[in-house]
């Protein structure tokens, strides 16, 4: 007979390959798969591998025109999740040739673009990705990184302090600038536009940039320290976003900001390249992350979004607090904090790290602890996050009964006291409250 056998085929015949030895150049993914009742895990795992690489539901004649063995994703290992019924961790290896160089957008479109609506699966979560050095080297990464940022700001040996200006919407540009000035004058290193401050009728972006720049220069002159305000350049188009970044550079301010998930990875990488070329630091807010990462069995874990950001580019990224008002488990949070900062991270399942990750000297990103934290959390934050971090107190600064500047003073005094106590060998976890009480005098 002519032709090939058509019809619906089991994915596992082609895409389940338990004998496969992964290559150093493969992108590896760990998926948490919950198959529909009656679907065997091998078939579910193979379906994920197929649909996120070369597969479709049947044999097509054009399969004969290429080498599936060279290009197909492979499900190479499956393990049941302890304590969960009918849930598996499925490991998939993708050949490097499937991905465009230097494009986080293309990487995500391939790996998570189509499989999440798949009928054979009840739920699917991407838990981790191993990005090989061969692919990492095609990305610029963060515009500057931790060390260059410290050198630009001339601030060493302690976490940096920030504050989100509240109320986040409704202030005029002039009053917004006043709030910025008071915080910086009191001793903070940075203040921040909230993620949804773009260019609204009550405060257009250009007015805000001008008044914030004035506040920065005034506070710098008064304190003798370098100050910054994260000017949110996020906009409706890439062109408008770059226009705002250009204006920030012309004002001579040190840092701009972007909402990387709502803005998108293409826009983010564009801005990161501009920032490196023009000496601007880039602060990244993760607005919308919980839509993607909050469900335990469906979506994408934040550690994957954090890795993607380090490739796409950003000097700071919000990464949870462990102690504040938003969700985050300590070991898991510290796992992706290390993924942001360190050059090499060892596989450690207790911290949710499924693969060892080598960043080949792509610069590190400062994790930002923000959300419901205040001065009494300072000892815990100093201990948990260490020096290479940004601690951001919004209400924890502006909520001070005497005003913004005293609120900023309180945070700076508490931070300096905690760092000094730690350097003197005191136990911050045990003696934290006492350290803060002493500093208050």
Curated annotation (Swiss-Prot):
Reaction(s) the record says it catalyses: 2 (2R)-3-phosphoglycerate + 2 H(+) = D-ribulose 1,5-bisphosphate + CO2 + H2O; D-ribulose 1,5-bisphosphate + O2 = 2-phosphoglycolate + (2R)-3-phosphoglycerate + 2 H(+)
Binding-site residues for Mg(2+), renumbered to this chain: 192, 194-195
Q: Consult the record and explain the modifications the protein receives after translation.
A: The disulfide bond which can form in the large chain dimeric partners within the hexadecamer appears to be associated with oxidative stress and protein turnover.
- What InterPro entries would the database entry show? RuBisCO, RuBisCo_large_chain_AS, RuBisCO_lsu_C, RuBisCO_lsu_C_sf, RuBisCO_lsu_fd_N, RuBisCO_lsu_N_sf, RuBisCO_lsuI
What are the annotated GO cellular component locations? chloroplast
The protein's matches in Pfam families, at most eight in alphabetical order, are given as:
RuBisCO_large (PF00016), RuBisCO_large_N (PF02788)
Assigned EC number: 4.1.1.39
Give UniProt keywords alphabetically: Calvin cycle, Carbon dioxide fixation, Chloroplast, Disulfide bond, Lyase, Magnesium, Metal-binding, Methylation, Monooxygenase, Oxidoreductase, Photorespiration, Photosynthesis, Plastid
Check the record and name the SUPFAM superfamilies matching this protein.
Answer: RuBisCo, C-terminal domain (SSF51649), RuBisCO, large subunit, small (N-terminal) domain (SSF54966)
Required cofactor(s)? Mg(2+)
Matches recorded under CDD domains: RuBisCO_large_I
Q: Name one GO molecular function term.
A: monooxygenase activity
On cofactor binding, the record's note says:
Binds 1 Mg(2+) ion per subunit.
What is the uppermost EC class here? lyase
Compartments annotated for it: namely: Plastid, Chloroplast
Residues bearing N6-carboxylysine are 192
Q: Which residues carry this modification: N6,N6,N6-trimethyllysine?
A: 5
Q: Which residues bind substrate?
A: 114, 164, 168, 286, 318, 370
**Site (described: Transition state stabilizer):** 325
Active site annotation, chain numbering: 166, 285
Q: How does it assemble?
A: Heterohexadecamer of 8 large chains and 8 small chains; disulfide-linked. The disulfide link is formed within the large subunit homodimers.
**Task performed by this protein:** RuBisCO catalyzes two reactions: the carboxylation of D-ribulose 1,5-bisphosphate, the primary event in carbon dioxide fixation, as well as the oxidative fragmentation of the pentose substrate in the photorespiration process. Both reactions occur simultaneously and in competition at the same active site.
What is the additional note?
The basic functional RuBisCO is composed of a large chain homodimer in a 'head-to-tail' conformation. In form I RuBisCO this homodimer is arranged in a barrel-like tetramer with the small subunits forming a tetrameric 'cap' on each end of the 'barrel'.
Q: Which family does it belong to?
A: Belongs to the RuBisCO large chain family. Type I subfamily.
What is this protein's record name?
Ribulose bisphosphate carboxylase large chain
Organism whose genome encodes this protein: Drosera dichrosepala (Rusty sundew)
């Amino acid at each position: 007979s002519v032709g090939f056998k058509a019809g619906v085929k089991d994915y596992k015949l082609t895409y389940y390959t338990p004998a496969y030895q992964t290559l150093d150049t493969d992108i590896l993914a760990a998926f948490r798969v919950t198959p529909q009742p009656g679907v065997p895990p091998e078939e579910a795992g193979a379906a994920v591998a197929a649909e996120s690489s070369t597969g479709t539901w049947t044999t097509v004649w054009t399969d004969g025109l290429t080498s599936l063995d060279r290009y197909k994703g492979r499900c190479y290992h499956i393990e049941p999740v302890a304590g969960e019924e009918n849930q598996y961790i499925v490991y998939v290896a993708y050949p490097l040739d499937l991905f465009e160089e230097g494009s986080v957008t293309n990487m995500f479109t391939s790996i998570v673009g189509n499989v999440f609506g798949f009928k054979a699966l009840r739920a699917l979560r991407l838990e981790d990705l191993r990005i090989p050095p061969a692919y990492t080297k095609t990305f610029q990464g963060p515009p500057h990184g931790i060390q260059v940022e410290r050198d630009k700001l001339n601030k060493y040996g302690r976490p940096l302090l920030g504050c989100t200006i509240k109320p986040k919407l409704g202030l005029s540009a002039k009053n917004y600038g006043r709030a910025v000035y008071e915080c910086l004058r009191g001793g903070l290193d940075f203040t921040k536009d909230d993620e949804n401050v773009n260019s609204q009728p009550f405060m257009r972006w250009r007015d805000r940039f001008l008044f914030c720049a004035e506040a920065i220069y005034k506070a710098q002159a008064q304190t003798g320290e370098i100050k910054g305000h994260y000017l949110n350049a996020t906009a409706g188009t890439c062109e408008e976003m770059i226009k705002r970044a250009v204006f920030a550079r012309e004002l001579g301010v040190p840092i701009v900001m972007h909402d990387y998930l709502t803005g998108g990875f293409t826009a983010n990488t564009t801005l990161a390249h501009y920032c490196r070329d023009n000496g601007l630091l880039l602060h990244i807010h993760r607005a919308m992350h919980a839509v993607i990462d909050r469900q335990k069995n469906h979506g994408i874990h934040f550690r994957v979004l954090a890795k993607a950001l380090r490739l796409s580019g950003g000097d700071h990224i919000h990464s949870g607090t462990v102690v504040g008002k938003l969700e985050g488990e300590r070991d898991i949070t510290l796992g992706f904090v290390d993924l942001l900062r360190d050059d090499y991270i060892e596989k450690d399942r207790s911290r949710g790290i499924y693969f060892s990750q080598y960043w080949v000297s792509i610069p590190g990103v400062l994790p930002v602890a923000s959300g419901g934290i205040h001065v009494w959390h300072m000892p815990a934050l100093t201990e948990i996050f260490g020096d290479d971090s940004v601690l951001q107190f919004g209400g924890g600064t502006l909520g001070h009964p005497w005003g913004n500047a005293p609120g900023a003073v309180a945070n700076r005094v508490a931070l300096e006291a905690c760092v000094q106590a730690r350097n003197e060998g005191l136990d911050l976890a045990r003696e934290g409250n006492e350290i803060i009480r002493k500093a208050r005098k």
